[in-house]
Amino acid sequence: MADELERVRISAAELRAQASSFNIHGDDVKDLREEGKKQRQRDSKRPDLQLYKPGVGHPNRRMDSVEGAGSDTLIQPDGFGNDPKMSDESPTSPGCSYMPGTGNEDYLNDHSKPETNHKTDGHIGGDKHKLVDENAVKIIERAGTPKSPKQSRKMRKPDRQIYQPGGRRSQGNKEVGASKELDRDRSREEEVDGKSIETPLKCEKEEKRKNRRGKNDRKKQASVETPSANKTENAVENISNKVSNLHLETVESKDRDRQDDTNQIKHSEEGRKIQTGGANRGMGEDKKKERGNGKSRPGKEKGNNQVFDKKEEGEAGGKASEAPHLEGRKQRNFGAKEASRDQNLNHEKQQGNRPKEKGKPSERTDSKRVNAASKRYSQSDIRRPRNRTYSTSSASSGTSMDGLAEAERLKAEGQQFSARTLERATGQREFVRGGQTRSRRRTARTLSSTDSLEENEVWEREGRRSRAAEEAKSSTRKEGGILRVSLDKREEQASRKSTRGRGRGILVLPAHTDLTQTPDPAPPLGGMRGGMGLGRGRGGRGGGTRRLWDPNNPDKKPALVSSQQSQHASQHQALYLQQGGCGPLHFLDTDDETVGSPPVRQGEFFQNQQAAAMAYYKFQNSDNPYCYPVSANSPNTPPRYPYPYQIPYQIPGSNGMYPASAMTSFYGPYGQGGPGYPSPTVSALTPEEAEVQTRGELGKFLRLADSQELQLSNLLSRERLSQEGLERMAQLRAELLTIYERVILTDIEFSDSQNVDQTLWKNVFYQVIERFRQLLKDQNSDTAPQIKTMLMTILEEGAVFFDSLLQKLQSVFQFKLQDYMDCMAIRARPLRKTVKYALISAQRCMICQGDIARYREQASESANYGKARSWYLKAQQIAPKNGRPYNQLALLAVYTKRKLDAVYYYMRSLAASNPILTAKESLMSLFEEAKRKADQVERRLKQDSDGSAHGPKGHTGGRRGEDAARVEIWIRPSEVSGTSRPTGSESGKDSEQDGELGALSASDLNKRFILSFLHAHGKLFTKVGMESFPAVANRVLLEFRALLQHSPSPLGSTRMLQIITINMFTIYNAQIRAKGQGETRSALEEQAISLGLAMFGLLVQRCTELLKETPTEPIPAEELGEFDEMDDEEGMVRVSVFPHDLRELLPSMKVWSDWMLGHPEKWNPPPCSMQGSPDVWQCLADLCNSFSRVYHGEVLLYKADADGEGDEELRVLQLEEDKMLSGFVPLLAAPQDACYTDQGTDAAIAADCKRVTVLKYFLEALCGQEEPLLAFKGGKYISMAAPLTPSINTENKAQEQEDDVIVEESSLSASEGEIDGEMEGDGSEDDIRELRARRHALAHKLAQQQKRRDKIQAVLQTGGQLEIEVRPFYLVPDTNGFIDHLEGLRKLLACGTYILVVPLIVITELDGLAKGQDSREGVGNGAHARQVQDRARAAVMFLEKAFESRDPSIRALTSRGNTLESIAFRSEDTSGQKGNNDDVILSCCLHYCQDKAKDFMPAERNGPVRLRREVVLLTDDRNLRVKALTRNVPVRDIPAFLIWAKVG
């Protein structure tokens, strides 16, 4: 700890100003009396009511103002010895604080002599009479009002205003009188400066004469009430002589002074008397400014006079014997001044932060001068640079510990003082202050005037009791003193041997002195606080140092910082400063205005420069609780533990992290007596304190690890790794592993909050592995084997480390991983907090083990990821709600090209409690790839079908037109029922697939199904291409149905569970997207639920078929037991005889039933089913009927006890599907009840019994819904759900939407006169004008669309080859077809393969022909007309019957594209249409020709343009056929089409 030096705070400008005021204003005695009253009020106050405590932050600890310098020494008991008298009699003055060992003894002796002469000359002049004797002024004021009553006032906190520079600056303008007096006296300051410089010998002679005079003066002044001019002049002469002889005593004189034990108490008593005997005018004025009220308190004088009168009576006998003793020491003290002065200079050089200030020419010009500083701020609010060699904290600051430390030193040294050196110090102070032109004011805050001497003595005794304990801490401190600057360099070497500290500012001490406590849970490692770097001085306004004590928050304790070193020692301690270790602590000043700083003793420096250059972390001396290594070759390095971890390992006694005794677990895992890890001292720490302390140390380790990781990253960033770099990398990795493992095993909760597990993997392994893998790719074949060997070595190290860490986690936190690998997402009993965090850490270790195994396989160029998959699955079993293991499993699936597994695991990682959001992008890429492959498969199938269509074209008439530029490809559809016939572009594909799916092998069908399944879910996930989702979903259902028919099933139970899980996730994801839309299901969610229910319905249907095929057998009555209510007439099906295919389906059905029980709002009311989907509810009713014949009591299942546990003879029955889907968010709401079975039962049969039980419960729940979907009627279960025809409904809805659009467009192109008539009939002229403008805009839009279609048509006609793929489904006959080929149309309608679309204009023409309206020909043609009329009537009757029976294979179409289900009202106004009736019929055909450029444009540049048509125009009219060919509408006559379609 730095040496503490007592400092003198004096304002020479104030003394000179008051001396001048006495000379000019002789009538200001009354003001001086008032000032003296206030000074005595300050002198008798003691703000330090208790010993300094760093954590308390007492507001009255800082008493460092100039005016209070005298009272500062008086009011603190900690700055002196154990004797209360010594504290009470501390000799100070307004200009000189009590400075042990610096020459204050002379000043004490001078004032201890009786004053005999009170008369001086009538003026103030000469070299020695420049200043007013403040003690004389105090004595005059003390005698002024002896009977004044005492007044108590409320004590204010002195620190709040003392440390506020702004407040002090503003105080200088409050007292105008004092400022004017100082301004008038500035002209006399130079004279004072020149005449106040005296040699030490001359000062000593003058002091002898004044000592004899001073005693008589004080005796007479004590009885005089009002001071006279002579007394004032005598006081001026006395104080000027003492100030002129102020000097600094050397260490040698201090050692000799320690022998004077007999005079110590008297000196202190006389100092107390002198201190309270006088005050200067400036101090009183500043006291008014700080108080803020300007009121005098004369009531305090009485108490002060009483106290000091008593002290004077007891001092007379001891003063006479002091003169010879002091006279004999003058020569010794004078001879030692130069050595002490040069020692101070040497310490200032070592500190390196005391630059010279401008404007001080006499700072280093004479060996008799010392550096000093004026007050902080002058009354004119102008800051001046200055050197401050005094301290406000060693002898007068209540907030510092210097006073306490000084008291300990004085007690050990005997507390000897010398009056002669005190007088010299006073003279030197006058010399130093003489050079200042402005005075700096600083106020002091004290206690109330009611404090008595007895109270002071009580405080002194309390302070003595605590000094014995503090004495040991301050054994290394040096004596304080006033620093002197000397130009004589011959004594620099001698002065360095006794370095001195400077006691000023805030003493920075650790909050706890033992290693078991830490003041800061996470102190910073790098750098020093406050900008105190190496070589930076503390001087200058706003210098490098910052306040450690906030003046705006006086109650907040000061911050702790590490010690600062001098510039000369910077090369030894550069490493220490960089690493931020907790070295020796020292003083740091609280204000920014200081210049220069004495050197601070830092303890032992680092001797190893190589260790410093390597930037290893190391604490100093006993501040290092964990000696982290520097280098193996360094002499200061403790033994280093190489990788792997070799520190002794043991299990702590208790599993708690922070026991109240002494952080047992903090050191337990590493061995209490291991090298480099000192055992902690047992202290009564609470768990909270131990936690704070431990986390503070761990925070240091983590910051150390950050710096080392930075070095490791820098090494890895190099282009090439040298051998030295590799060794350094290995060393850094070993140290990082040690640090991270220590943090994890010490405080697992703190480790989890700081993500230490992931940081360990990323910093120590991942970045190194990735760097070596990159080098392995970039390097040539020569160095590749070496790099691969190093990579494999690192991977092996990682495997060993994480395996060891898993074992240590189990040992430290006392648990077994095997007990928790049960895939329980929610446990009945909560885990211990430490075990919970340890399980999370163990899961991360297993994931890291899997990553290492994966890297090893990739490095060895093999694809056997079985070991990595095993680690990931184990990690998933520990904490199934974490999404990370699923993400890693998805990576393995991508590597092995298992797309369904990859999609499943990515969805699991997204549907976890802590999802991996990056899996969404991975899913997008997988779905995009599935879409691309599905398109390729569809294109290949189309090419195959095209080849088959080209083959028999000659026989079937598939080619129409011999022109090579136009090719028609006709594809014959197979027979399907009209009710289930799909529409759209996929109309002709399903029949083809029906024939092909049965011919495919199981593996090929499985691949096609997986591709279609992923394609459909990709549309649901991305919401792209939803217009083709029904067709894709239908294909998925067809392939899934075909796949279920295979035995054995190519899917398996696991793959089936993945399919069901993907369906649940799609619904879950659609629900998330649809949030905020209310309770109604969105269209996306509706489609996802429909697909999931359809696939579940197929599963139920297949399960019911397998149950019906399973043989039954009678069950004995004694075996039935509680199941005797079952109907056993026809026998029952045992669970043990279930076929294998049924066993494979039961897990998936059970999981989906759990989901339905947990989310009833998703399926009730039932959504619209999809095309190709069975009736799900009817299938469930059939399954319920089949389950009524199943006997599931072969294995008895038991519930848990009331306390949640089963019998010891039972075992928990956990299904594999529950383990697999544990932690899946959509299933968390499903009911999960523990189930137990006997020990000797068959687990597989017991599991099937549980599944059947759950399914029966689910079916009963369907019957118990508010609107039941199943009901038991007539001895069996039936479906109560309303029958839906989703395919027709959805088709009609889509058709109606399209029709509405067409109607709107057609109406715009209709008769303009009709629109104009409507506009003229209603509305004003503005409305008519607006409607006309709208009409023209829409007409323009239609014209643009028509123009675009014309361009497309021109491209088709003038381009390359045109291929038209014809898949007939919609047949549009004209009027001649009904007249000439009515029977053929009847056959086409009866086959149900096609839909007969009758234009309304054709029905209108048939009505006209049936009525004979068009028979205008001659008589010769009458027979033909009657024949036409009869055929027309037959056609009308045919159409009316067909529409009345609501045959789905026939429909009517208006000219505007509207579909009619009835022809009861079939009149249509066609007056506004352009063209004839043939054009209207052709427009109906074009309604089904929805061409899209992206569909028919060729993929290649010169490829053929391919159009798809599902409509065929049936006509014999040549003109209409020509028009149809120009619009690319397929056209055939009815007989030819009947032959091609093989109908009839």
Swiss-Prot record:
- Domain PINc spans what residues? 1369-1522
Mind telling me which CDD domains this protein's record contains? PIN_Smg6-like (cd09885)
A single Gene Ontology MF term assigned here is: endonuclease activity
- Low complexity bias locations: 389-400, 562-573
Identify the InterPro entries for this entry.
Answer: DNA/RNA-bd_Est1-type, Est1-like_N, Est1/Ebs1-like, PIN-like_dom_sf, PIN_dom, TPR-like_helical_dom_sf
One Gene Ontology biological process: chordate embryonic development
Q: Composition bias, kind Basic and acidic residues: at what positions?
A: 25-48, 108-141, 177-209, 249-273, 283-330, 338-369, 421-432, 458-495, 547-558, 936-947
Q: Upon deletion of the gene, what happens?
A: Morpholino knockdown leads to a phenotype ranging in severity from weak to severe that are developmentally delayed with disturbed brain patterning, necrosis in areas of the brain, aberrant eye development, impaired somitogenesis resulting in stacked somites, perturbed yolk sac extension and posterior axis extension with a high mortality rate of 93% at 5 days post-fertilization.
Where in the sequence does UniProt note compositional bias of the Polar residues kind?
223-244, 976-986
Indicate the transmembrane segments per the record: none
Q: Which UniProt keywords apply?
A: Chromosome, Cytoplasm, Endonuclease, Hydrolase, Nonsense-mediated mRNA decay, Nuclease, Nucleus, Telomere
Q: Under which EC number(s) is this enzyme classified?
A: 3.1.-.-
Obligatory cofactor(s): Mn(2+)
UniProt-annotated location(s):
Nucleus, Nucleolus; Chromosome, Telomere; Cytoplasm, Cytosol
- What is one Pfam family matched by this protein? EST1_DNA_bind
Q: What does this protein do?
A: Component of the telomerase ribonucleoprotein (RNP) complex that is essential for the replication of chromosome termini. Required for normal embryonic development.
Quaternary structure and partners: May form homooligomers. Associated component of the telomerase holoenzyme complex.
Free-text comment on this protein's domains from its UniProt entry: The PINc domain confers endonuclease activity and is expected to bind the catalytic metal ion.
**What name has this protein been given in UniProt?**
Telomerase-binding protein EST1A
Q: Which organism is it from?
A: Danio rerio (Zebrafish)
Q: Which gene codes for it? A: smg6
